[in-house]
Amino acid sequence: DKGIHIYTHGEMLPAHAYPKLKKYPHLKGNFGTAWQNQQKEFDNLPGAILYTTNCLMPVKPSYADRVFTTEVVSYPEMIHIGEDKDFTPVIEKALELGGYKENQVRTGINGGEYVVTGFGHGTVLGVADKLIDAVKAGDISHFFLVGGCDGARTGRNYYTEFVKQTPKDSIILTLACGKYRFNDLDLGEIDGLPRIMDM
């Protein structure tokens, strides 16, 4: 144990609900928002960055010295961790940089500090009776599946506005990076179930 805290980014957010991943005490949370915000969120980040998927923005010089890739992901001039999975360079860089000196508060794009995740099929099936009862009782009128990429540029906020306008007796199921446009909104609960369920 070297005291390194590990955070996911982007579409790795739902992984925090996976028992085989969340059993590791070094995994502390999710840093930042969607993949398209990497350049802003990784700028001057005092930690090592390991890309595991191809949602990769061009790497800026301000953090190029701390970027590593693995699996099918690669980027010119970045160190690639091969099949041997020797993460020594990543660990050494993390120790060298030391992380933030003080606790940081990060918000979603709407200012929210918390998101709930983990509503994969197993979890949803585990509360299916509760959902069915809520529908039969008239407490839930609609389910909306919002899957897609809203993007980060001004004016690309269709899903944000859509979700804000959904009836208070509806459930929003999320997929893909478009969720970052609204997953930090506090839309409340219905019968103890959050109105936003990140799948």
Annotate each PLM feature.
Residues 1-199:
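Metallocofactor- and cofactor-centric catalytic cores in central/energy metabolism, strongly enriched
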